Amino acid sequence: MKKRTFTKYISLFLLTIGTINCTDLDEKVFSSVTEETYNYTLADFGPNIAGAYAALNYGYVGTYWQTQELTGCCISTPANASGWDDGGIYKRLQFHNWNSELGQISDLWNNYFTGVILCNSAINKLERDLIPSPSVTEKQTGLAELRALRAYYYWILFDNFGDIPLVTTMSQDLPEKTPRAEVYDFVVRELSEVIPSLNEEQGGNMYGRINRWAGKAILANVYLNAEVYTGTARWNECLSQCNDIINSGKCDLSPEFKDSFRAQGVESSKEVLFTIPYDYNRGVVGNYLFMNSWHSELQKKFLLNAVPNAAGGPKGTTQFTDTYQEGDSRLEDTWLMGQQFDAEGNPLYGVYDKKGELLIFSKELPDGNYTNEMEGYRYNKQEVPAGSEWSCSTDIPLLRYSEVLLMKAECLLRTNQPGAGELVTEVRKRAFKANPSKAIVTDDELKENSSYKWGVVEKYQITDPGNQDPIEFGRLFDERCWEFVWEGYTRRDMIRFGIFCKKSWLSHKPQGDHRIVFPIPQRAVDANPKLTQNPAYAN
């Protein structure tokens, strides 16, 4: 199932969802019509599986990405002269003063539980043979893929919310919360059971879908964070999954760091293990991160058919962009910085509070509350083709082989085994091609403290350093940030390294250990009396 076919199935499914949501049909009657009397054919087998992925497309940038990156220390969205306050919704994420009514948190809950429901429905149709299968083997492979995808959705949910409802059937009963550790056990068990049945093909027909190596990478991530979830570390279990992926010979690093983020050619990538495919022309939309981060004048630089959102919102925190080592090409491969020109090489100019001045993106932010239209480096990680609309057709990778190598490195460090430096060096090599010797890092160096300058910033200066305790394996934390910033890892990494609720950065100060999880959305609590609010959020 190539990307074009896969996105076609997703677009058809999204259209169907839109039609259903606009009806006023009784749920029982509708279920009876579709599942008991609708004449499914063999042609419905592929779309049934593809449709379960739809929650990823429309639920990423505005919900998952914001809750994972804007809550961390690398990216911030201060207000500016063109707007971007929006009632303080972005600042609440940065300041960690969110509540149960914040829209991004509610949408995160809704989108990923929608994914669970889509998986349960698709599994139900296959298990009951309501949809014909090409063969017994393909039926089992399809069921394995859907169960793995459901496990992925559940991982994201219990990672973000802690105790959550665990539902695996099409029951209409209101569910109670299941303890986080039990949902963790379910996810581990599901993935362990289905991985042997997942397709081994890397890319090609499995592009955008969970194959065996993506399944193992998901399980490795769950094990990597097991101590956070259950109190018991599972480093060796994570190490085992990483070794399986590495030893398979199916996966590898791409020659260039930017290769995973190109608009074309990623389908054959050995590095991208799991991705969200987008296709604007087919209605599979939702990749608008560039629209949010870019200044409106950049339309002339990238020849877009849509105008980016005013002066742009998300931008790099100075404290993070200052950590890059000299010669690391990932700095320019990740961030748009310095003077900007249009597609013909003519200078661009400010149009808001710096109207008429040369458009030059500087790295300095005065604080996390307000910036001028030019302050802060902008998003430059993905290729955005000329002619792109408000959503581009470049895919968003969720899991890359480079993370497998860095997960293994972390497990080796945390179990006092040698070899972490060699793995991290392998990832760094493509970022230091001009000076290969600078790519080399040792095990001992990875055990050093982070180079991040923590503390509250006012008028461009750190005025309150806050907690300055050394970070265990802090250099490895830096390496992960340099490699994965903008990709939705920051919140989870900061929690695992013990700094999410301890450190200060930009205008953020610690707000309590309960911020390790989000509150259950108030609308969900109001709708289901069996749901209890997470501790410290109840009032």
Please annotate each region the language model reported.
Residues G265-S268, D469, V485:
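Extracellular/periplasmic catalytic domains that process cell-envelope and extracellular macromolecules
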Residues T23, C481-W482:
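Low-complexity, Ser/Thr/Pro-rich intrinsically disordered linker/stalk segments at domain junctions
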Residues A43, I49, Y53, Y58-G62, ...:
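Elongated scaffold/linker segments in the mid-to-C-terminal portions of large proteins
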Residues K216-V222:
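TPR/Sel1-like alpha-solenoid repeat signature
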Residues N236-N247, T425-K429:
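TPR/TPR-like (Sel1-like) alpha-helical repeat modules
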Residues G18-N21:
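C-terminal motif of bacterial Sec signal peptides marking the signal peptidase cleavage site
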Residues T23-P47, A54-I210, Y223-V228, K381-P397, ...:
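Aromatic-anchored glycine-rich loop motif in surface-exposed flexible loops
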Residues K2-I10:
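Bacterial N-terminal signal peptides that target proteins for export
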